[in-house]
Amino acid sequence: MTNKIRAIFDRIAPVYDQLNDWLSLGQHRIWKEMAIKWTGAKPGDTCLDLCCGSGDLALRLARRVGSTGQVSGVDFSANLLETAKQRAQSQYPQPNISWVEANVLDLPFKDNQFDAATMGYGLRNVTDIPRSLQELHRVLKPNAKAAILDFHRPNNQQFRTFQQWYLDSIVVPLADRLGVKEEYAYISPSLDRFPIGKEQVEIALKVGFTSATHYPIANGMMGVLIISK
């Protein structure tokens, strides 16, 4: 299953940012900035961005921690990491980011290494959510926070119906035009499988986080899980 998901993200790498704009109605940048603020990341911190994709959150984190800080961007898609590296190289001054090809279920970092962490639109695609949160807990320093942002199924039936219509009538046809229809058709079933906010909180507490709160965003079509070690 992991290899199948990795292959999907390798194929969509060239249009990943464009499709994120469509999926979020252009709002993902606002939500990412909000997630970073929730982590409490500050200048000089060592931070982690899991499932970093094309590097958007990692670059934002790097601006937050500044030249005295350090960010590690982790993804299992080599193609997306290459896109992230190219984006970083076009920045001035050069951000202090290490790009790491790795699986979030087995992070290549020491215990208690990071001051803050983010994950944007990645948890829903992880094959073992408890294991990924357990690994995140391991590498965070005591009292460190993480913010995990992702799409969700809203509880309200009207918004749920709108979300499904938008996916079926807007996102998938646009993905089809870009040659990645099959890759983006997986989103709807992935939303159906994804634990709701309350369940995410329960999982986070069970693996050892001292506090966990889930905030619905965009009428429940999005959410952010804030967890503290």
From Swiss-Prot:
Enzymatic reactions: demethylphylloquinol + S-adenosyl-L-methionine = phylloquinol + S-adenosyl-L-homocysteine + H(+)
GO process annotations (BP): methylation; phylloquinone biosynthetic process
Lineage: Bacteria, Bacillati, Cyanobacteriota, Cyanophyceae, Nostocales
GO molecular function, one term: 2-phytyl-1,4-naphthoquinone methyltransferase activity
Pfam families the UniProt entry points to: Ubie_methyltran (PF01209)
Entry EC no(s): 2.1.1.329
This protein's pathway: Cofactor biosynthesis; phylloquinone biosynthesis
Organism, scientific name: Nostoc sp. (strain PCC 7120 / SAG 25.82 / UTEX 2576)
NCBIfam families for the chain: MenG_MenH_UbiE, PRK00216.1-5
Family statement: Belongs to the class I-like SAM-binding methyltransferase superfamily. MenG/UbiE family.
Top EC class, one word: transferase
Entry protein name: 2-phytyl-1,4-naphtoquinone methyltransferase
Keywords for the protein's UniProt record, in alphabetical order: Methyltransferase, S-adenosyl-L-methionine, Transferase
